[in-house]
A protein has these predicted regions:
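Conserved acid/base catalytic micro-environments in cytosolic active-site loops
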Residues: 1-304
Length: 304
């Protein structure tokens, strides 16, 4: 009998544009299998309801329909966006032409960035793995990541990403001091923000209400980035469903910070990056293969 992990690469080999949703139990083992499936090209995942829970089954049905509709409505991508790969494996360039009908926001650095803030959702683990792999040993600032995931999954994601890339990737903890070159992933069910105290920047976790139906959400992270770092904050929005990150990006842009977004062709779902781009807040729109190099250039003080 073939399990899902074995089947994933074979499905993508036969149908490169297939969107696969992984059904997972909310356990440590289930989280580990799900992260592996996402790194192999699964587009998204959904938590299985507990046996005998009618309310849970109804939530499962609703969430599954939302994911299917979101993935199905996205334009057909190149096989590049979904091809099986190890977490942290570099990505090759897409051949799709960039959108020319979108107005870009501020493209001029006012100050060299002192911190990097990344938001992602559907398709995010594979995209994050590629970006982190390109930054490890080269990024000279702390990197804060909000990926839409439940508790336990984010810890497993941090572990897998650290092993795959060799980077210092950790699940963030409340009160943790930010260190240059380290990557902090917001824990599931907590918003992650930053705060400056006595000249140092610390991570703050809270369970205030979900934003954009998400906790953790990207908007509060970006708002805190604007408040703490201002024009020295650099935001990035990767593939994801919905529009989380757009309003936070608006606040960040108003303070002079730049926001880079992933392009439509290389995104599994161009919801979050598309929302920022169509709002005219993006400094540049790049395929995932160019996100890492662009980030490094901006961190060196080069305009995107």
């Amino acid at each position: 009998v073939m399990d899902g992990i074995t089947a994933l690469p074979r499905i993508h080999a036969a149908a490169p544009f297939a969107r696969i949703v992984m059904a997972s139990t909310l356990t440590h083992q289930g989280a580990a299998v799900t992260i592996r499936a996402l790194s192999l090209g699964a587009a998204d995942y959904i938590a299985k309801p507990d046996a005998g829970q009618i309310a849970g089954a109804e939530d499962y049905r609703r969430d599954l329909l939302v994911k299917i509709r979101g993935l199905g409505s996205s334009a057909k991508r190149t096989a590049y966006a979904l091809a099986p790969r190890r977490l942290g494996q570099p990505l090759t360039a897409t051949t799709a032409a960039p959108r020319k009908d979108l107005a870009l926001g501020n493209k001029t650095l006012k100050a060299k960035p002192e911190a990097l803030f990344i938001g992602s959702s559907t398709g995010g683990p594979a995209a994050l793995g590629a970006v982190v792999a390109s930054l490890v040993g080269k990024a000279t600032v702390p990197v804060f990541i909000t990926q839409h995931m439940p508790a336990m999954f984010t810890a497993i994601l941090a572990e897998h990403m650290a092993k795959a890339t060799g980077a210092k990737v950790v699940e963030a903890k409340d009160g943790m001091a930010a260190e240059a070159g380290s990557f902090y992933i917001a824990p599931g069910d907590f918003h992650m923000t930053v705060q400056r105290r006595a000249g140092r920047v610390f991570i703050v976790l809270d369970q205030s209400p979900p934003e954009n139906f998400c906790r953790p959400a990207v908007d509060p992270l970006f708002r805190s980035a604007a408040a703490v770092y201002g024009e020295r904050a650099f935001g990035v929005v990767l593939t994801g469903m919905g529009h989380d990150g757009r309003e936070g990006a608006r606040v960040l842009a108003s303070k002079g910070g730049l926001i880079l977004v992933q392009d439509e062709a290389s995104s599994v779902v161009w919801g979050m990056p598309g929302a920022v781009a169509t709002a005219g807040l993006a400094c540049a729109i790049k395929p995932i293969s160019e996100i890492g190099p662009t980030i490094l250039n901006v961190l060196r003080g080069v305009n995107p």
